[in-house]
């Protein structure tokens, strides 16, 4: 059993309990009023708690901004360092009785050796609450899959969604996060990984059954550091000798199609005669032009469609095996063997 122990409204609580609010605030009681109003609305599950949360949490950032009237770096450092020290104190109380999986700014994820140990955990946390003036919240989880502290998916016990259909699992990191329209890159791979962890569905099943072309896209952009994109150049390896007579291997590029567009919707291709897509800076290094650089996380063989692909059918050329391999490579980072 896993338990996520979070400090409720941590930074605002520290500012109030330890008087670490910016010294430029003339009436701290107003901040306390916002704090308690938000807690009341949250307990009622009232969505109006959200704007109060934004006001409370943005205060810390304002104290670090020298252009803000609330600028007070000493108090901001008190909040940050003091908060971490209090959390470290809690970790030291718990570590002999459970396994610490990870910690972050305002919480700790622990693994209980036995479910019966929860009462002991609760007692230790209660004692910490009495000493510090903070309040802890608990969430129980059944499984944790973790690549590192910033990339994980935590699966709850019981239903995966609440009564409103909102996901009860927690995830963080590029491999498993839900993508928005602004960062809709390789969504089919993310979905394959999440389906594997939540439902035990193989990446092959998720990817092969997908019929939405947009879900396979990787969007890349030519930044201002580069002149243009180059599609499908011939790439060869050659051995030469440097000025000291030592043998070394170099990569040479020839041909390819210069692209005038700056943004590309890239897809993996089964056609081995098609190459990858590269960005060209045109910089001169040691008397010769710097080699083109391959766009990150793009296939060696690809095609691109820069028009709207919303209703386009999946072309036979799309290499779904490429996406399956990417999904398994990322699962391996979580410790899953193919």
Language model: regions and residue ranges:
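C-terminal, non-catalytic extensions of nucleic-acid polymerases
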Residues: 49, 88, 111, 116-338
């Amino acid at each position: 059993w896993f338990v996520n122990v979070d400090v409720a409204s941590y930074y605002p609580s520290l500012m109030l309990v330890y008087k670490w609010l910016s010294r430029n605030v003339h009436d701290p009681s107003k901040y306390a009023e916002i704090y308690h109003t938000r807690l009341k609305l949250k307990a009622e599950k009232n969505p109006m708690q959200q704007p109060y949360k934004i006001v409370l949490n943005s205060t810390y950032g304002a104290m670090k901004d020298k252009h803000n009237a609330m600028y007070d770096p000493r108090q901001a450092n008190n909040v940050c360092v003091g908060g971490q020290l209090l959390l470290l104190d809690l970790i030291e109380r718990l570590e002999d009785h459970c396994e610490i999986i990870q910690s972050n700014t305002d919480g700790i994820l622990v693994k209980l050796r036995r479910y019966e140990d929860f009462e002991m955990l609760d007692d230790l946390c209660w004692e910490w609450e009495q000493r510090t003036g903070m309040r802890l919240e608990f969430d129980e989880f059944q499984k944790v899959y973790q690549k590192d502290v910033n990339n994980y998916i935590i699966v709850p016990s019981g239903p995966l969604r609440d009564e409103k259909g909102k996901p009860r699992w927690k995830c963080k990191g590029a491999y498993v996060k839900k993508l928005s329209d602004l960062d809709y890159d390789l969504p089919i791979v993310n979905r394959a990984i999440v389906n594997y962890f939540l439902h035990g569905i193989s990446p092959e099943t998720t990817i092969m059954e997908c019929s939405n072309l947009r879900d396979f896209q990787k969007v890349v952009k030519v930044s201002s550091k580069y002149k243009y994109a180059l599609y499908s150049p011939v790439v060869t390896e050659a051995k030469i000798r440097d000025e000291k007579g030592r043998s070394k291997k170099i990569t040479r590029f020839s041909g390819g199609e210069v692209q005038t567009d700056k943004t590309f919707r890239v897809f993996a291709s089964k056609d081995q005669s098609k190459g990858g897509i590269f960005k060209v800076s045109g910089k001169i290094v040691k008397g010769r032009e710097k080699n083109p650089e391959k766009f990150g996380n793009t296939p060696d063989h690809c095609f691109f469609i820069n028009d709207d692909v919303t209703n386009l059918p999946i072309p036979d050329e799309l290499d779904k095996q490429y996406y399956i391999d990417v999904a398994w490579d990322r699962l391996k980072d979580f410790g899953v063997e193919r």
